[in-house]
Amino acid sequence: MVRARNLAKRFGDKRVFDGLDLDLPPGGFLLVTGPNGSGKTTLLRVLAQLAAPTRGELVLPPREVVGYIGHEPLVYRELTPLENLTLFARLYRVPERGARVGMLLERFGLWGARHDRVSTFSRGMQQRLGLCRVLLHEPELLVLDEPYNALDGAGAELLDAALDDLRGRTFVVATHEPRRVERLATERVAFA
């Protein structure tokens, strides 16, 4: 569950958002839209517990069960996808690591490149690998900031299918492509 009451975030004199109320039940899907610089990323960072609100009440799941992907996927470019996911699976204490890693690499079309250095990947392939990393530990709350960023048509379709498969989990998604996830949204926040 995600609940916010009178949530506010400021940077000095700049008000990013103020008086925000949210009620997102387990399994809900919050779609966050708005132009660049409107506060989408700041809100997502607060909900992912990477930044503190300036004011307000906030009820969130424990940090260990939150998965977050920002504009830049957190992956090690000098490693292979297999090495990246195996490392994160150990850190997250994922049971049956090999099977989980293999399934995610296959799901996101990276199995054939599992032994290639991430530094040779396109931005879209790195984004898909970042999504694999986020999904490794099967988080209860997924906070995705522009997950379609840099994905080509095939990559976007793979993400669409993954989001459909993950219905029942709680999502907060900011995107400039709301049409891709509109069908999943149960709640909306639109920044001006």
Spans of features found by a protein language model:
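Helix-to-loop junction immediately C-terminal to a conserved catalytic motif
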Residues: 48
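Hydrophobic anchor residue at the start of the ABC signature
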Residues: 131
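Conserved ABC ATPase "signature" region
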Residues: 86, 96-113
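The feature captures the beta-strand-to-loop junction immediately N-terminal to the Walker
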Residues: 33-35
